[in-house]
Amino acid sequence: MAKSGKRLEELVEELAAPHAAALGLELVGVELVKEGAYRYLRVYIDKEGGVGFDDCEALSRVVDAQLDEILPNPPYDFFEVSSPGLDRPLKREADFARYVGHKVVVTTYAPVDGQKSFVGELQGLVDGRVTLTLTEGKGRGQTIALDRKQVASARLYVEF
C-alpha cells in the first residue's frame, strides 16, 4: 500500500493521468509486477497513431520525479513507461468502445460451450456483456455475448 492507503497502482494512475492528458496521451493502465528478483512499476500509454520513445520519456520524467518525492523508499525496483503493445488489453468500457470492429481474443474463466478462448470481431460492450462475431474456430460466423464477469481477459488480436 502507498502512504495514502491506496494501492500503488491507483496512486500512480491518479498522479500520471493529468500529465498524460496534458501531453496528449491516453493512460491505458498501471501495473506492479514481479519478474525474477525484481519488481517493475509499469505505466502504459497510447495515442492516436501510436506512441513513440519521446512520448514515453516525457511522461516518465515528470511522473518519476513526483514518485521520488512521495515515495522515498519505493516498493519497486524499476519504473517503466511504454505502449501497451499491438495486443493491448481491453479493460475499461472506453477500450471496448474504441475497438468496436477490431479483431479480438477473449478468454473466459470457465468454459462456455466447451471452450475458453474466442476470436472474433468486437461488436461492443453493452449492459455488461461483451459481444463478438466469431471469425475462427467453433461457431465461426456466430455472434455471441459473454457476461463481462465471465471474461478473464480481452485483447486485440494480432495477425502476422
Curated annotation (Swiss-Prot):
CDD domains: YlxS_C. It holds the Pfam family DUF150_C. InterPro entries: Ribosome_maturation_RimP, RimP_C, RimP_C_sf, RimP_N, RimP_N_sf. One of its GO terms (biological process) is ribosomal small subunit assembly. Its main location: cytoplasm. One of its GO terms (cellular component) is cytosol. Keywords: Cytoplasm, Ribosome biogenesis. It is found in: Cytoplasm. PANTHER family: RIBOSOME MATURATION FACTOR RIMP. HAMAP family: RimP. Required for maturation of 30S ribosomal subunits. Belongs to the RimP family. This is Ribosome maturation factor RimP.
